[in-house]
């Protein structure tokens, strides 16, 4: 059964490239779409291309960026075209939602905001180019759980694609590209010339029911994908590429978010591939919004100077119930890293990682209680973090310089650490001592080389000792719909 369009978005210039959405129950069928023109006439369109993809919602209305004056020549600024398109399509939120189609071309733009019940779809040959004009990046206040910007104490530049207080938002495509052209920002950062914190590529705040999928993200000025204070988030099939020495180009950073799923992503980064966060020092403690119920699976990461999965260091609101599996780490500094320090407060607990393959690493595991700077001098020196219930199992690592560096906090040890069925093959020039452990407590089973005495071996019969929850999280029950669009040209 096919549900076709019944309404046309008004006031669009003819001729146009129209973009239609309908929901398909079984398979895509060939159709001829009819468009009612302003005089009440109908004429048949020729289908040039049919697109089908999976999404949390399909849309009843659609338009192309060219309908709003967009020019994809790589030189014409399209910020207003994006803003006008989103404004017009926002009118259809209560009528089945709307989609904005970005066709093949190079679309130069500054920051623009999305709306609810909305899909931004990039053609496979579409490239969004971030403007190098600083005036195209509005400045907004720091995040309340951080108290200040990360690069500078004042505000922060709005992300290229931004949204706040939204519901049902999809950013997807046929592997279209978003290029942050971050070189200018990296130079300003290294030169100490930033008045405000660098923008991210995608940031959605205070939002729910989010899908970000099937895109390539290049050269972000800073973090790539940053959902914050949000819930019910699906990030799927994303490729993220940045020079390995580019500053703070984290891949995906869920921050004070609940019910998030990250899967089937490939990331090459100058910082952590996935960094789980929840606020900074006293600001994060006061805001009190944890990141919890997070699933990470089928992630491949290359990050020579940072971690594949990092927890912290801004974790003052708490991090709980993180489940990662089927992870591939290549030429990265550390596989799993927990970063915190005195003054952070908060907690990192109930962390489960299994099925990880690591090749050419500095450390397989790194935990430290002596990491990171503070937001300001008003942090509480008595705010000790709680690190407990850390479970790693079923892993193989090759060409590793050091198996683990585990450093808790004196008088505040990291507890409940469990490592089982892990084989680490050391590099030819590995450290003489493969494990260092201070102020940590836990157990191990079937681990090579033998861990520290503070992680006593429980015997080979208990190699499945460390927990991994059997029950699914709510985000795993989300079922995607088949959405299909026919791109038609009307001469």
UniProtKB/Swiss-Prot annotation:
Pfam families: Glyco_hydro_28 (PF00295)
Main location group: membrane
Positions annotated as PbH1 repeat: 230-256, 257-278, 319-340, 348-369
GO molecular function, one term: polygalacturonase activity
Membrane topology note: Single-pass membrane protein
Transmembrane segments annotated in the record for this chain: 15-35
Catalyzed reactions: (1,4-alpha-D-galacturonosyl)n+m + H2O = (1,4-alpha-D-galacturonosyl)n + (1,4-alpha-D-galacturonosyl)m
Keywords for this protein: Glycoprotein, Glycosidase, Hydrolase, Membrane, Repeat, Transmembrane, Transmembrane helix
Single GO BP term: carbohydrate metabolic process
Sites carrying sugar chains: 165, 175, 214, 399, 421
Protein name in the entry: Probable polygalacturonase
Active-site residues, Swiss-Prot/TrEMBL: 271
Cellular component GO terms, alphabetical: membrane
